[in-house]
């Protein structure tokens, strides 16, 4: 019965969205899976969007939808927001890529440091890259190899821990602990006291079900990590929007390195 209903739903979807299907079939000739973002993969095929305005999106078949997703928190201001468009046009009218230092880089860096209470900031191309460089920095700085992450965690396209460590993850030496289980996490840290380079944690699991971490859990895990000389990394790519200075600040927990992303980019 379930398979029958699912097949009917797929058929109804296909009947309603023929132009998206045509786009999908054409895109698959050049793009693996027909697109470049794995999270968008679903049966029978993803919708293709032609435009967006405010809180709505319009697909290539002319259907308009209210956007409750906001590009996975990256689109907090909505689509085609006038102030953003004006600044983009102004920036593009001055240059596109100078291949050198631009004064706006330091201005944005100062604003980031002031807002989030950080010492310095390094800009990257994505949240995935920010976490990659944070982990690499910890490995180089400590001379150790292991990195503690948590079940259900997601730190980018090559750092996925919904069911253990995904086979396509970047080749770090990961050890896992249950999220929000302080005793279990402290035991893992103790067991790897001489080999642990870093602890990487989201203050709230994003892809793992929007489960908030407790202040007690986060602070005790970071304290234990510091006691053995490991680097404390907070992944705030999806959570920094929860407070003016990020979610960790709301919880009263300080990281050594913090990764930001989504709407900030």
Language model segments and positions:
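Conserved PLP-enzyme active-site core in the AAT-like
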Residues: 164-265
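Short beta-strands and strand-loop turn motifs
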Residues: 7, 66-69, 198-204
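Conserved A3 ("GATE") glycine/threonine-rich loop of ANL adenylate-forming enzymes
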Residues: 33-35, 128-129, 153-158, 240, ...
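Active-site-adjacent loop/helix segments that line or gate small-molecule/cofactor pockets in enzymes
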Residues: 3-51
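Glycine-rich loop-to-alpha-helix module at the N-terminal edge of alpha/beta enzyme cores
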Residues: 64-141
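Active-site and channel-lining beta-strand-loop segments
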Residues: 46-67
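PLP-dependent aspartate aminotransferase-fold enzymes
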Residues: 107-198, 205
């Amino acid at each position: 019965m379930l398979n029958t209903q699912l097949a009917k739903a797929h058929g109804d979807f296909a009947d309603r969205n023929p132009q998206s299907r045509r786009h999908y079939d054409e895109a698959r000739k050049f793009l693996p899976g027909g697109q470049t973002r794995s999270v968008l993969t679903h049966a029978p095929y993803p919708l293709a969007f032609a435009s967006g305005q405010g809180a709505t999106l319009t697909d290539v078949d002319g259907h308009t939808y209210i956007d409750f997703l906001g590009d996975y928190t990256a689109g907090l201001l909505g689509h085609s927001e006038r102030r953003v468009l004006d600044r983009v046009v102004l920036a593009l009218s001055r240059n596109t890529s100078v291949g050198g230092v631009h004064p706006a880089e330091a201005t944005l860096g100062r604003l980031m440091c002031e807002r989030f209470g950080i010492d310095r900031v390094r800009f990257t191309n994505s949240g995935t890259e920010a976490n990659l460089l944070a982990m690499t920095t910890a490995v180089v700085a400590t001379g150790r190899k292991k990195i503690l992450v948590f079940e259900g965690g997601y730190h980018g396209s090559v750092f996925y821990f919904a069911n253990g460590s995904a086979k396509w993850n970047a080749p770090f030496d990961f050890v896992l602990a249950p999220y929000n289980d302080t005793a279990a996490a402290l035991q893992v840290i103790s067991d790897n006291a001489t080999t642990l380079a870093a602890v990487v944690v989201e203050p709230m699991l994003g892809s793992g079900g929007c489960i908030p971490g407790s202040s007690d859990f986060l602070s005790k895990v970071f304290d234990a990590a510091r006691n053995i000389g490991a680097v404390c990394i907070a992944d705030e790519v999806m959570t920094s929007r929860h407070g003016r200075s990020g979610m960790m600040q709301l919880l009263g927990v300080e990281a050594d390195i913090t990764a930001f992303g989504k709407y900030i980019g």
